[in-house]
Every structure is written in C-alpha cells, then in structure tokens.
Design a protein with these regions (language model features):
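Bacterial N-terminal signal peptides that target proteins for export
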Residues: 2-14
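C-terminal motif of bacterial Sec signal peptides marking the signal peptidase cleavage site
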Residues: 23-25
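Immediate post-signal-peptide N-terminus of mature secreted/exported proteins
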Residues: 32-70
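Stable alpha-helical elements in mature extracytoplasmic
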Residues: 40-43, 54, 74-78, 82, ...
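N-terminal, post-signal-peptide region of Sec/Tat-exported proteins
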Residues: 59-89
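Mid-length scaffold segments of soluble, non-membrane domains
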Residues: 88-126
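Extended amphipathic alpha-helical interaction segments
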Residues: 119-156
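Glycine-rich, aromatic-bearing surface loops/beta-hairpins
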Residues: 151-194
Length: 194
C-alpha cells in the first residue's frame, strides 16, 4: 500500500493524538486515603480549627490589657511541656515541637492581624474581654491532649501517598475564619513537611 505525502501529516497527527491519550491515561492521581485515615485527618483539622478559634479571644484580652502578643518565655515553657507529653504518648519529639510551635505562630498571626485592624479602626477597649486564665486557657488545656492523640495518629500517615493532597483539600473546608489562609497554612505546615 502506498501513501502519498499528503497522508503523512494526517497519520502523524492521529498517532500523536493516540500517544498523548495513552500518556494522559498513564498519569496517576494520588490514591485517596482510606476512610479511617480520612477520619483521622479530619479530626486533626477540626482540632486545629478549634484552636485557631481561640486566637481572637486572646487578641481581645491582650488588646485591653496592652500585653504583648509575643510571650517567648511562656511559649518556651508550654512547648517544653507539650513536647514532653507528646513524647510520653509516643509522638516523635521534633515532630511534636514543630507542630505545636506552628500552632503558636498561627495563633499569633491571627492576633497580629486583629490588632492591626483594630489599630487602623481606632478601636477602644472591649467590654467584658475574656479572662485568659479563667476562660481561654481551659479551652487550650482541653484541646492540647486531643491534639497530641491526633498527632500520634497522623505521624505515620503524613508519608502515605494521597494524604497530603487530601489534607490540603479538607483543610480549606474544615479550618476556617483565618483571614486569607495564612494562619491555616502556618498551622498545618509541619504536617505537610514530613
């Protein structure tokens, strides 16, 4: 069978289209985590969201009292405590330290942004600001052990194919009220970097 030169471009285009179709079919999307792993990830994201929801209360209290957002000595003491408790629960110490440091940084980012907004608005003191010792710390004290348990569940999952993409997708749904997503990104960075 003879082909004229004018048929070659058509055959080439057809062959190229078939090859591209085959290659596109070979691209694999990351597998979805199991339902059990999805539930573990969702639990962590809900806890991170609950912790970030405390940040505006802290910001209001510090706005009224004039206290600094940064409290390095207090943070260091808390970080040492939660890292030790995490290690006792079988969580890798550096993973726990990085994770809880990220929670502090995300919370401070929310506080800084609120203080900037209030300063720009010329905001005066809040009526009945939350008491950090009586109202806020008990919430954090309740969340911390749950975060440690969840961190223990996730430390082996974060390396499983498909977990990272699931985590990112669900985070935008479950971690809300954090301005433009920066506090969420900061809070979850240690889970993505493993």
């Amino acid at each position: 069978m003879q082909y004229s030169m004018r048929h070659l471009p058509v055959r080439w285009l057809v062959a190229t289209a078939l090859l591209l179709g085959l290659l596109a079919g070979c691209q694999s999307t990351p597998p979805s985590p199991s339902k059990e792993n999805q539930a573990a990830i969702d639990r962590m994201l809900v806890l991170v969201d609950e912790r970030l929801e405390v940040a505006p209360q802290v910001a209001r209290s510090k706005w009224n009292s004039g206290a600094d957002i940064e409290a390095p000595e207090r943070e260091a003491a808390i970080l040492d405590r939660v890292t030790g408790r995490s290690a006792e629960a079988g969580v890798d110490e550096s993973f726990a330290r990085d994770f809880f440091q990220a929670q502090f940084e995300a919370s401070k980012e929310v506080q800084r942004r609120l203080h900037q907004r209030w300063l720009k608005e010329g905001r005066g003191p809040f009526d009945n600001p939350p008491d950090l010792a009586e109202e806020v710390r008990p919430v954090l004290d309740r969340l911390t052990p749950a975060l440690i348990v969840s961190l223990g569940e996730l430390q082996s999952l974060v390396k499983v194919p498909g977990v990272g993409s699931y985590l990112e997708a669900r985070a935008t749904e479950l971690v809300t009220g954090d301005f433009d997503g920066d506090p969420r990104r900061i809070a979850l960075e240690p889970l993505k970097d493993r």
